[in-house]
Amino acid sequence: MEKFEGYSEKQKSRQHYFVYPLLFQEYIYAFAHDYGLNGSEPVEIFGCNNKKFSSLLVNRLIIRMYQQNFLINSVNYPNQDRLLDHRNYFYSEFYSQILSEGFAIVVEIPLSLGQLSCPEEKEIPNFQNLQSIHSIFPFLEDKFLHLHYLSHIKIPYPIHLEILVQLLEYRSQDVPSLHLLRFFLYYYSNWNSFITSMKSIFLLKKENKRLFRFLYNSYVSEYEFFLLFLHKQSSCLRLTSSGTFLERIIFSGKMEHFGVMYPGFFRKTIWFFMDPLMHYVRYQGKAILASKGTLLLKKKWKSYLVNFSQYFFSFWTQPQRIRLNQLTNSCFDFLGYLSSVPINTLLVRNQMLENSFLIDTRMKKFDTTVLATPLVGSLSKAQFCTGSGHPISKPVWTDLSDWDILDRFGRICRNIFHYYSGSSKKQTLYRLKYILRLSCARTLARKHKSTVRTFMQRLGSVFLEEFFTEEEQVFSLMFTKTIHFSFHGSHSECIWYLDIIRINDLVNPLTLN
């Protein structure tokens, strides 16, 4: 406890106190839209809802905020809000969108500065590659094969609005910004749906997504902070990846309150974290806690996490939100992949010398597959096929040129293959390629009022090459002169790319409208 109090005092000097004045700078809103604003000239900004906005409206919003008592009245009397101008729906929608995006940019600045000044990044080789989504899968392949039990955790909710405001107090003590945050939380009518369901983080109105995503990440980082801190204190190894989470100033006060509710709880639970083979992974409102310990230890972990959420965040967590399974008897949906460690082992045959004995070794395998149903459903929502997977034309693209249509379909196909290159079974991906290829042919045939057969004969190999993925090109070069290789075979080579930093909209069904 004394060690943490000293660390907490050290982190106070890194806090940023004045970020609110940045809301009066026009370039902040230009950054929010990733579009340049040139003085007073009207510049069209295409927001997420495809509506045109002018930089003149940004200037009007800044002038309104400069006027005395406008923001104070907006916070104290939200029903009589004149800042967002509810009398005009267009102004109200634009002001709420641009102000929330600008506020999200401003509150992210202290965290970004802390990450830039964090020395741990320089100590980790190829740190940029660790930002890839796929970088976690080689880690799982290497570590999960030796573990026994898996805990599926749904990060608890709901949480009170004031707790979210307090979470930002640890990052910044700019009081006006905190008041403005309260205004946004109580202003948006869809706030309750965000907290009530983790799926709705992808279904929010797009103009609010950045702000609410930042608040959600702040809440989750606070939830994980306690686990990371205890593991760092009990482990002999230094966790270089937890530095950005250890920026809190009143954690010692919470620990004192925690100790009053449970005397000696801190000392009794520290041994939970002494297992060097305990691994924690979080994704999309869910978390996985894998360990080599016994079933009794995992049950104690479950009880501890339930009590921790109840007394650390002051709300009740249902025990059913934490499921315990043996690793060999369970599978988990992770970033679009269905991952598991099958009971059947993989036979590996080794031979040290040419005429020596053959040594058969059986080892576990970390299996990653792709389910066809969610991806076909995504293509169906995007109007590339029916719900049963029957390809259809894309009428809204018939006004484009032939090469633009080919390029769009080919790019979607390559992106899906690129993201799911780690799948051990490629049959699902080839089914998606068939759907996209035939949908493209039907779109072109509809544009030229012809048949699919005629267009396929006219384009020939050019049409097929557009859907030729990078992975298949690599395999074709490897196996052209050695063995017969079929792209539609059952090869199970897994390739993980380190340039994927986000989930594609077609990959993640929740992002589709």
From Swiss-Prot:
Where is it located?
A: Plastid, Chloroplast
Q: Which GO terms describe its biological process?
A: mRNA processing; RNA splicing; tRNA processing
Q: Under the cellular component aspect of Gene Ontology, which terms does the record hold? A: chloroplast
Task: Please verify whether the record's keywords include Plastid.
Answer: yes
**What Pfam families does the annotation carry?**
Intron_maturas2, MatK_N
Q: Keywords for this entry?
A: Chloroplast, mRNA processing, Plastid, RNA-binding, tRNA processing
Gene Ontology terms for molecular function:
RNA binding
Family of the protein in this entry: Belongs to the intron maturase 2 family. MatK subfamily.
Described purpose of this protein according to its UniProt entry: Usually encoded in the trnK tRNA gene intron. Probably assists in splicing its own and other chloroplast group II introns.
Check the record and name the HAMAP family matching this protein: MatK
Protein name, entry field = Maturase K
- Which species is listed as the source? Zea mays
What's the encoding gene here? matK
